[in-house]
Amino acid sequence: MAVVKEVLEIAEKIKNMEIRGAGKIARSAAYALQLQAEKSKATNVDEFWKEMKQAAKILFETRPTAVSLPNALRYVMHRGKIAYSSGADLEQLRFVIINAAKEFIHNSEKALERIGEFGAKRIEDGDVIMTHCHSKAAISVMKTAWEQGKDIKVIVTETRPKWQGKITAKELASYGIPVIYVVDSAARHYMKMTDKVVMGADSITVNGAVINKIGTALIALTAKEHRVWTMIAAETYKFHPETMLGQLVEIEMRDPTEVIPEDELKTWPKNIEVWNPAFDVTPPEYVDVIITERGIIPPYAAIDILREEFGWALKYTEPWED
């Protein structure tokens, strides 16, 4: 029983943030399961299913906050579990896993297009938009609005300590969109010239709270103070089913050396601690709308999305744990 090296490589890249962004993480996880199914040397269906569960568990343990990862695994593995429990043979189960992974990736990519279409309707000609971190869903909204001929400008925060704002700024600029790049702490200063805030999400809870890159909550709060609309762009697979049962979302704490270089940190007094949370929680009252591939909803409607999309998931143990 063996997990193929490509799965281990993808898991490591997710863990060390070479693969970043909730959507890309989810698609990469689904693709890893596809590779495991395609490359498995298992000689019988039981051995194959054990390998699939082991691969899914390794992927699951890489990042604790972004719910897109376990939701992608659930999508693929739940379909595999049904086939396995129904008596599928090795090749039948392999086919189900591969097809489920491809289907998830396809649906995820189409969701970005739909989010762009819905979100662009809320962007007006001449808008100055502020964004934070790097979200393909948020970028889709701005890119679609620009392609529709709307004259927009985007303020991009740098997003310390991993500088995801640089990725966003360069991507938006590559589409021809005018970009203003600012330090995170300048967000409030420039909010007075901002018309809309558009950001992504790593997870959305049952009450509509948004878990996203650290700094998101401060920008949303500042926007509320200035009466600027905050719009969160997120695929439905970023909604967190376990929060329906009262589970809290774990906020990932990352290595202090992402903030202070290791050599410098060694010279600091021992009574200084460096804390590096990767995410924060934006209360639903700071969010005006959530843009999904199913349409634009208010935060309090998150529970409806969860019931419809993931109600089934609450009835079963995780398909990689049984």
Curated annotation (Swiss-Prot):
Pfam families named in the record: IF-2B
Catalytic activity: alpha-D-ribose 1,5-bisphosphate = D-ribulose 1,5-bisphosphate
The name this protein goes by in its record: Ribose 1,5-bisphosphate isomerase
SUPFAM superfamilies listed in its UniProt record: NagB/RpiA/CoA transferase-like (SSF100950)
Entry function: Catalyzes the isomerization of ribose 1,5-bisphosphate (R15P) to ribulose 1,5-bisphosphate (RuBP), the CO(2) acceptor and substrate for RubisCO. Only accepts the alpha-anomer of D-ribose 1,5-bisphosphate as substrate, being inactive on the beta-anomer. Displays a strict substrate specificity, since other phosphorylated sugars such as R5P, ribose, G16P, G6P, G1P, FBP, F6P, and PRPP, are not substrates. Functions in an archaeal AMP degradation pathway, together with AMP phosphorylase and RubisCO.
Swiss-Prot/TrEMBL site (Plays a key role in hexamerization) positions: 227
Keywords: Carbohydrate metabolism, Isomerase
Additional remark text: Reaction proceeds via a cis-phosphoenolate intermediate.
Organism this protein belongs to: Thermococcus kodakarensis (strain ATCC BAA-918 / JCM 12380 / KOD1) (Pyrococcus kodakaraensis (strain KOD1))
MF-aspect GO terms: ribose 1,5-bisphosphate isomerase activity; S-methyl-5-thioribose-1-phosphate isomerase activity
UniProt xrefs under InterPro entries: IF-2B-related (IPR000649), IF_2B-like_C (IPR042529), Initiation_fac_2B_a/b/d (IPR011559), M1Pi_N (IPR027363), NagB/RpiA_transferase-like (IPR037171), R15Pi (IPR005250)
UniProt family annotation: Belongs to the eIF-2B alpha/beta/delta subunits family. R15P isomerase subfamily.
EC number: 5.3.1.29
Active site: 133 (proton acceptor), 202 (proton donor)
Any one Gene Ontology BP term: L-methionine salvage from methylthioadenosine
Residues holding substrate: 20-23, 63, 135-137, 212-213, 238
Induction details: Up-regulated by nucleosides (at protein level).
Subunit structure: Homohexamer; trimer of dimers.
Activity regulation summary: Is highly activated in the presence of AMP, with an increase of >40-fold in activity levels. Among other nucleotides, isomerase activity is slightly increased in the presence of GMP, but CMP, UMP, TMP, and NAD(+) have no effect; therefore, AMP is likely the major activator of R15P isomerase in vivo. To a lesser extent, various compounds with an adenosyl moiety, such as dAMP, adenosine, or methylthioadenosine, can also act as activators. The regulation of this enzyme by AMP prevents excess degradation of intracellular AMP by the archaeal AMP degradation pathway.
